[in-house]
């Protein structure tokens, strides 16, 4: 009696749903060893990422992100098949730490080669790009002592170190530009917005290592609704004491109209968001104006238990109308510097 009860509890019969067709299996590196012995290549990035689809966990989510991004790219083909004549608009959002890191060069590649149409970033995502043109950022350690670093004029971003002299160079570089912008505002009636301000910085830096430079060259707008929340805000603050008869004025309302108009006029919309916070919400909310995006890829390490926007999965945005109910969507949980270069290698750069 006891044995029968226990067996009934343990050996419950399975009823496999019809949609469970993919068996879990990892990459067989032996196969690629044999190919190398025959004079061929080892495993390629595309083959590795394809194998992720059957590994499970976040590997499968990364595979799905690659699949979704490649579908976005297919809809951006300049000569698409007739059934895909509605060209997709791709929105890219990223946080400032990614520009501080070597992900900057990955992002620059996307902008240089016109892989995306609209960008949203934070103030740091703007200023750190310029600052890197003026002085290097170094790899340090997460555990360096903050008090000692401060005494040496070294700023820590995770395990990255930015000499404070770089920000001094930034001030020297940007102040003459702010002077010219104020002059144009007062004498020519130039109406500045955060995005036109960023575009001007891209023009002035004139450096091919810069994301902003390529955005200027390729006419890709960069929006930053929290532009004053960083070193740029410090510079604007200091400049108010020198500007006459009035300081530089940036019209954020004009930018929200332009940002939302990109979404409203998009035939189809895909969003790629690296990190969370303002960049994530700004892009998603713009897509609300068109009843949601058709494709969505989130990559961040935040969880949803605290109700944060950063932690929210794409399905939460579906409830708000920011992503369509039938959209292709995925969230990859992980750190962007580890994941995004691999994703780009399997999509835009393949």
Swiss-Prot record:
Pathway terms, separated by semicolons = Protein modification; eIF5A hypusination
Which sites bind NAD(+)? 96-100, 122-124, 128, 229, 276, 301-302, 335-336
Gene3D superfamilies given in the database record? Deoxyhypusine synthase (3.40.910.10)
Report the active site residues: 322 (nucleophile)
- The coiled-coil regions, if any, are none
Enzyme Commission number(s)? 2.5.1.46
* Biological-process GO terms, alphabetical: regulation of cytoplasmic translation; spermidine metabolic process
The residues the record assigns to binding spermidine are 127-128, 234, 281, 307-309, 316-322
The UniProt entry's sequence similarity note says: Belongs to the deoxyhypusine synthase family.
Q: What does this protein do?
A: Catalyzes the NAD-dependent oxidative cleavage of spermidine and the subsequent transfer of the butylamine moiety of spermidine to the epsilon-amino group of a specific lysine residue of the eIF-5A precursor protein to form the intermediate deoxyhypusine residue.
This one is known as Probable deoxyhypusine synthase
Q: Which organism is it from?
A: Schizosaccharomyces pombe (strain 972 / ATCC 24843)
């Amino acid at each position: 009696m006891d044995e029968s009860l226990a067996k009934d509890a343990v050996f419950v019969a399975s009823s496999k749903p019809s949609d469970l067709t993919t068996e879990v299996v990892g990459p067989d590196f032996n196969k690629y060893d044999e190919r190398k012995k025959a004079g061929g290549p080892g495993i390629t990035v595309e083959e590795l990422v394809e194998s992720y689809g059957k590994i499970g966990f976040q590997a499968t989510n990364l595979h799905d992100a690659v699949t979704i991004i490649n579908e976005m790219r297919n809809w951006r083909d300049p000569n698409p098949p007739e059934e895909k004549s509605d060209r997709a608009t791709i929105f890219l959002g990223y946080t400032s730490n990614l520009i501080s890191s070597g992900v900057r060069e990955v992002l620059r590649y996307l902008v240089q080669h016109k892989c995306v149409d609209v960008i949203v970033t934070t103030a740091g995502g703007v200023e750190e790009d310029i600052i890197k043109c003026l002085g290097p950022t170094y790899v340090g350690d997460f555990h360096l002592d903050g008090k000692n670093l401060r005494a040496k004029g070294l700023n820590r971003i995770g395990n990255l170190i930015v000499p404070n002299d770089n920000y001094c160079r930034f001030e020297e570089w940007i102040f003459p530009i702010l002077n010219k912008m104020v002059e144009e505002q007062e004498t020519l009636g130039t109406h500045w917005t955060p995005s036109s301000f960023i575009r001007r910085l891209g023009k002035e830096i004139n450096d091919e290592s810069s994301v902003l430079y390529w955005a200027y060259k390729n006419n890709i707008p960069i929006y930053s609704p929290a532009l004053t929340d960083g070193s740029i805000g410090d510079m604007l603050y200091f400049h108010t004491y020198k500007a006459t008869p009035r300081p530089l004025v940036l019209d954020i309302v004009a930018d929200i109209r332009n940002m939302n108009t990109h979404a409203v006029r998009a035939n189809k919309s895909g969003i790629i968001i690296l990190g969370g916070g303002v960049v994530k919400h700004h892009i998603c909310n713009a897509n609300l104006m068109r009843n949601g995006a058709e494709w969505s890829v989130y990559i961040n390490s935040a969880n949803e238990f605290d109700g944060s926007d950063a932690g929210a999965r794409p399905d939460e945005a579906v409830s708000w109308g920011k992503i369509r109910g039938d959209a292709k969507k995925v969230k990859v949980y992980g750190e962007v510097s580890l994941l995004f270069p691999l994703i780009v290698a399997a999509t835009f750069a393949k």
